[in-house]
Amino acid sequence: MNISYNWLKEYVNFDLTPDEVAAALTSIGLETGGVEEVQTIKGGLEGLVIGEVLTCVEHPNSDHLHITTVNLGNGEPTQIVCGAPNVAAGQKVVVATLGTKLYDGDECFTIKKSKIRGVESIGMICAEDEIGIGTSHDGIIVLPEDAVPGTLAKDYYNVKSDYVLEVDITPNRADACSHYGVARDLYAYLVQNGKQAALTRPSVDAFAVENHDLDIKVTVENSEACPRYAGVTVKGVTVKESPEWLQNKLRIIGLRPINNVVDITNYIVHAFGQPLHCFDANKIKGGEVIVKTMPEGTTFVTLDGVERKLNERDLMICNKEDAMCIAGVFGGLDSGSTEATTDVFLESAYFHPTWVRKTARRHGLNTDASFRFERGIDPNITIYCLKLAAMMVKELAGGTISSEIKDVCAAPAQDFIVELTYEKVHSLIGKVIPVETIKSIVTSLEMKIMDETAEGLTLAVPPYRVDVQRDCDVIEDILRIYGYNNVEIPSTLKSSLTTKGDCDKSNKLQNLVAEQLVGCGFNEILNNSLTRAAYYDGLESYPSKNLVMLLNPLSADLNCMRQTLLFGGLESIAHNANRKNADLKFFEFGNCYHFDAEKKNPEKVLAPYSEDYHLGLWVTGKMVSNSWAHADENTSVYELKAYVENIFKRLGLDLHSLVVGNLSDDIYSTALTVNTKGGKRLATFGVVTKKMLKAFDVDNEVYYADLNWKELMKAIRSVKVSYKEISKFPAVKRDLALLLDKKVQFAEIEKIAYETEKKLLKEVSLFDVYEGKNLEAGKKSYAVSFLLQDESQTLNDKMIDKIMSKLVKNLEDKLGAKLR
C-alpha cells in the first residue's frame, strides 16, 4: 500500500525523515519495502520551461511541419521544428529543453538535438499528454498571455514533491489499511521512544443538515451481512474537476483523479480506511435504498460493463425496482454519479467480512473496497467518514446537505475485553518490561484500561483491532511497539524440545530412505496438500465421502485435502511429459487426510478427521536409454518392486515375515499389497490403470507405490540391527526346475522354502520363467535357485540332499509342484 509522507504528517506530528519513518514502521511490524521521491506530475517537469513563439513559418520540406523560433527567457531565440496544427507566433508554450526526460507510462525518452527533414530542432514544444498534465494530444499547450518566458514549468504548474512509502500490510492488520491507521501505529512508536507527538484528524463538528428536500429511506433486510448501513443526501451538486490539492494527493499515491465527487470517496478510503459509495440520488427508484440479497441467477451489470449472474448470498444495494451495487465490492453501471448528476446519496457502511470475501471470490473481483471490507474495517468510523464526505462534497461540489443521516445499526460494535497478566507478558516476551511501560504502550494504541490489579490489567480493545482479541495478541502489540531489538537474546535457551524419541528417529530414517532413492536416480517432489475433489469422483478406493473439504476454497482446483499422494505425482509426470521429459522417477513424503462420518462426536469435533504420513514412488518411461552398450529398455513393475524391497531391507524389515497379496481396483490394474502378519498395510505397488492415466493426459505406463510411513515406523520398532563377520565356510547353490499351475506366484515358493529351512537357507531367487510348447495346459515352469550356507561348518552332499528333498516334498504337497 502506498503511503504519502506529507499526508501522514497531517495526522501525526513528527520530525523524522522519510527513511527514518520507513525504519520506524518496519520495526513495529508494518514492513516498508521502499521509499520513493515522487512529484504530483511524473518527472516533476524537470527541464521544461515556459517559452514564447516569436516566429512560425512552414517547413519547406513538409506539408504539416512548422519551423519556429522560441524565446526561452535566456536572451537567445531557440529554433524548434513543431508538427502541431495549432502552433502560431505570439503563443506562450511549454518547451522541453535538451536533456529533458519525458515519460510515457513507465517508459521515458530524452530530448536531443536533431534534424527534422533537414532542419535543426533544439527542443520540443509540448502537448498535455507529453508532460503528464492531461490526456489531450490534439495540439500543443497554449498558455495565458501573462505566462512569463523562462519560468520553470514546475513552478508555473506548482508541482509538489513528496515521498511514497511502500508499506506491506499483512492480512490481519485491516486497521492499518489507511494513512490514519498507519499514523496510529507511528504515534505509539513516537510515544514509546520519548518523542512529543499528537494524533489528530479533521473535525466534523460543523456538519449540519440544511434542509430535508431529498429524504431517502434506508431498509436493511439482512443485518447479518450488513450490521451497519448509513447514508445522507447532498442536493444541487456540480460534478467537475477536483481542486489541485485533492488531485495531487491522489496522484502521489498512484490514483488517477476522476471528478470531485469520486475523488472525495477515494480520498476518504485512503485517509481513514472507510470505503464509500456515491449514488446518483435521482436514479434511486422509489426513494428507498434496500440492502438485501437477490434470487439465484439474477443478472446484474457492473461498472466494467460485465453482466454477472448473482448468487443468492451476494448482498446487494437495491432501490425499489433494481439492484444498484454489489455491496462492498463493485458498483453498478447505471446507478453511479456522472457529470450530469446534480443530487447524490452517499453510502457509508460496515459489511460482514465473510460475505464480502465470498462474493468477491465468486465474481473474481478485487477492489479497494473489497480489500478492506473482507479484512474487517472499523464499524464505529462509518458516521464520521460519512459526515466528512458530505462536508467535502458541499465544499468542493456545492449543494446542500438535504437529509438527516440514516443510520441503520443492528447493534453497536463492542470493545473486545482482554485480561492481561504481567507474568504472561514477561513469559512470552522473554524479558521483564516495566509496568508503566506496558500501560503507556497499550494506551498509546487506544486500548482502555478498565481495571488494574497488581497482577495485570483488564483492557478494552477497540473494535477496529480485529486481530487483537486474546491476551497473546495484546502481548504481540506490546512487543512490537516496545521494540524487538530491545529484547536481548539470552545466553541460554530453556526448551521443552528433546533430541530423542520416535519423531527424531522417523526423521532420520526418512532422510536415510530419501538419500537411498536419490542414489537410485529418483527426484523428490513436493506437491500441494490441497487438491481437486473431482479427482475422487466415482472412486471406490478413495471415496469422495472421505474427503476433508475446504469451507472457503480459493478455487475448484484446490477445494479439498488429498487422500493419496498419487494424483499430485501424476500431475508432475504430466507436466514433465509435456516438456519432453518422459523418463521419470519421483518420490514424495507427505500427509494424506481422511474424514469418517461414522466417527462424528459432538464432544470431540476432530474425531472424524485423521491424517497419515505416506511415501509415494512413481516410475515411468525408460529404465535404460539407448547407447553403445545397451538398447532401450522400458521400466517395469519389477523395477518398482525392487525399490520397495530395498527400502524395506534398508529399514531392517524381514521380508519373509511379511504377507503379500494381490490387488486390482480403480487405481491399479494389477498390484501387490504388503501387510504385517497382524494385517496392517505397509505398502501397495503396481501398475496404474489406463483410465486413471488418461484423466491426467499421461501416455506412458506409470508404476506407483504407496508406503504407509507411520505403519512402517511401528513395524520396525523391534528391529535390531546386528553385525557379524562374513562366514568362513563356502555357500552352496542348488537349482530346481519346477512345473506349477499358472496361478502360483514366486512369493509362495519363497515363503514355503524359508519355512522349510530356517537356518541354512540364505537366499531364494527366480532366474527363469517358461510358458509354451511341451508344457501341459495351465502350467508354467519356474527355474529357482537356492543358496545354502552353514556359519559353523562346510556343508556336505548328504546334508544338502536332505534339505533339497525336504524342499521338493513341501513344494509338491503345498503347491502341487513337480520336478521337470
Swiss-Prot record:
It comes from the Bacteria. Residues 413-489 form the B5 domain. One of its GO terms (molecular function) is phenylalanine-tRNA ligase activity. It catalyses: tRNA(Phe) + L-phenylalanine + ATP = L-phenylalanyl-tRNA(Phe) + AMP + diphosphate + H(+). Residues 42-154 form the tRNA-binding domain. GO terms for biological process: phenylalanyl-tRNA aminoacylation. It holds the Pfam family B3_4. Its cofactor is Mg(2+). Keywords: Aminoacyl-tRNA synthetase, ATP-binding, Cytoplasm, Ligase, Magnesium, Metal-binding, Nucleotide-binding, Protein biosynthesis, RNA-binding, tRNA-binding. Residues 727-820 form the FDX-ACB domain. Its main location: cytoplasm. It is found in: Cytoplasm. The keyword Coiled coil does not apply. Its EC number is 6.1.1.20. Binds 2 magnesium ions per tetramer. Mg(2+) binds at D467, D473, E476, D477. It is an enzyme of class 6 (ligase). Coiled coil: none annotated. GO terms for cellular component: phenylalanine-tRNA ligase complex. Belongs to the phenylalanyl-tRNA synthetase beta subunit family. Type 1 subfamily. PANTHER family: PHENYLALANINE--TRNA LIGASE BETA SUBUNIT, PHENYLALANYL-TRNA SYNTHETASE BETA CHAIN AND LEUCINE-RICH REPEAT-CONTAINING PROTEIN 47. This is Phenylalanine--tRNA ligase beta subunit. It comes from Bacteroides fragilis (strain ATCC 25285 / DSM 2151 / CCUG 4856 / JCM 11019 / LMG 10263 / NCTC 9343 / Onslow / VPI 2553 / EN-2). The lineage of its organism: Bacteria, Pseudomonadati, Bacteroidota, Bacteroidia, Bacteroidales. The gene is pheT.
